[in-house]
From Swiss-Prot:
TM annotation in the entry: 15-36
Keywords per UniProt: Membrane, Photosynthesis, Photosystem II, Pigment, Stress response, Thylakoid, Transmembrane, Transmembrane helix
Subunit structure: Forms heterodimers with both HliA and HliB; these are associated with photosystem II (PSII) assembly intermediates containing CP47 (psbB). In the absence of CP47 (psbB) and HliD, forms a homooligomer in vivo that binds 2 chlorophyll a and 1 beta-carotenoid per monomer. Cofractionates in an approximately 50 kDa fraction the thylakoid membrane with HliD. Associated in vivo with monomeric PSII.
Protein's recorded name: High light-inducible protein HliC
Annotated motif Chlorophyll-binding motif, positions: 15-20
Example of a GO cellular component annotation carried by this entry: plasma membrane-derived thylakoid membrane
Cited Gene3D superfamilies: Chlorophyll a/b binding protein domain
Entry keyword annotation includes Transport: no
Domain of life, per lineage: Bacteria
Organism lineage: Bacteria, Bacillati, Cyanobacteriota, Cyanophyceae, Synechococcales
Organism the protein comes from: Synechocystis sp. (strain ATCC 27184 / PCC 6803 / Kazusa)
Lumenal, thylakoid topological domain: 37-47
């Protein structure tokens, strides 16, 4: 990961943002489940 000329976008900057957005999504899903009493799929009517 030290190669800043990577062709696939695996840079420290991209990985930091990916981790941050993943935690926001996970936290949002957890809060939604706690507030509504339903899972995410049930909340949106998928299951």
């Amino acid at each position: 990961m030290n190669n800043e000329n990577s062709k696939f976008g695996f840079t420290a900057f991209a990985e930091n943002w990916n981790g941050r957005l993943a935690m926001i999504g996970f936290s949002s899903a957890l809060i939604l489940e706690l507030v509504s009493g339903q899972g995410v799929l049930h909340f949106f009517g998928i299951l």
